[in-house]
């Protein structure tokens, strides 16, 4: 494991690759960084860009960008699509049974073997036993990383999907730091899709 807890506190800006960037909720608290964000969906990428005008936003395939550009960065954050891992896959009222998305596991294995910098991969707790043991469990999220992450409090917004009310959605957007008046559920996805 790397000892990189002070990566963002050094004198120079940290070059960050934000994969599957979505609307940018994960990006809210990052400081002293130079960020390149990769988002597949142009409409979502535009919202990210509006909320983070100093970041470079790439509309494209996060997996391909990672393979080609990983060594240009000090730190990589990845939040691969969660929908096909989520417990909601089994809890839904509709018949949406599908295979889980292997991108999550591919990114973790790829970064473990082909990236020398620091990295974090985040996703929801899956409906199945994780294929790779996470380093941390934070609320409804699992974290994989190649460095120790200090424990911290993380708010856990409950029932924002199952209740589906405007009030719960607004609490969710506020928690994520998303400034967007539109529907965050776009093309069957919330926040980000390929990601």
What is the predicted function of each stretch?
Residues 16-66:
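SAM cofactor-binding core of SAM-dependent methyltransferases
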Residues 7, 65-75, 82-195:
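Class I S-adenosyl-L-methionine
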Residues 8-12, 49-55, 94-99:
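Intrinsically disordered, low-complexity coil segments
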Residues 12, 31, 53, 69-72, ...:
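Residue-level preference for short coil/turn positions at secondary-structure junctions
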Residues 1-15:
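S-adenosyl-L-methionine-dependent nucleic acid methyltransferase catalytic domains
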Residues 2-6, 48, 90:
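Intrinsic low-complexity, intrinsically disordered segments enriched in polar/basic residues
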Residues 19, 38-39, 60, 78-79, ...:
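Short His-Asn-centered micro-motif
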């Amino acid at each position: 494991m790397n000892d990189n807890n002070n990566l963002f506190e050094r004198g120079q800006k940290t070059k960050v690759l934000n994969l599957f960037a979505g609307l940018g909720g994960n990006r809210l608290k990052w400081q002293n960084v130079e960020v390149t964000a990769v988002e597949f969906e142009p409409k979502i990428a535009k919202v990210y860009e509006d909320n983070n005008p100093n970041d470079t936003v790439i509309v494209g395939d996060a997996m391909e960008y990672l393979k080609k550009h990983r060594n240009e960065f000090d730190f990589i954050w990845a939040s691969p699509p969660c929908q096909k891992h989520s417990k909601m896959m089994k809890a839904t009222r509709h018949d949406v049974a599908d295979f889980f998305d292997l991108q999550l596991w591919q990114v973790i294995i790829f970064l473990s073997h082909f990236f020398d910098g620091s990295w974090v991969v985040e996703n929801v707790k899956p409906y199945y036993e994780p294929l790779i043991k996470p380093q941390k469990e934070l609320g409804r999220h699992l974290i994989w990383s190649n460095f120790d992450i200090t424990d911290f409090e993380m708010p856990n917004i409950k029932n924002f999907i199952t209740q589906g009310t405007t009030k719960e959605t607004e609490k969710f957007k506020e928690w994520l730091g998303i400034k967007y008046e539109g529907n965050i559920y776009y093309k069957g996805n919330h926040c980000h899709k390929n990601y």
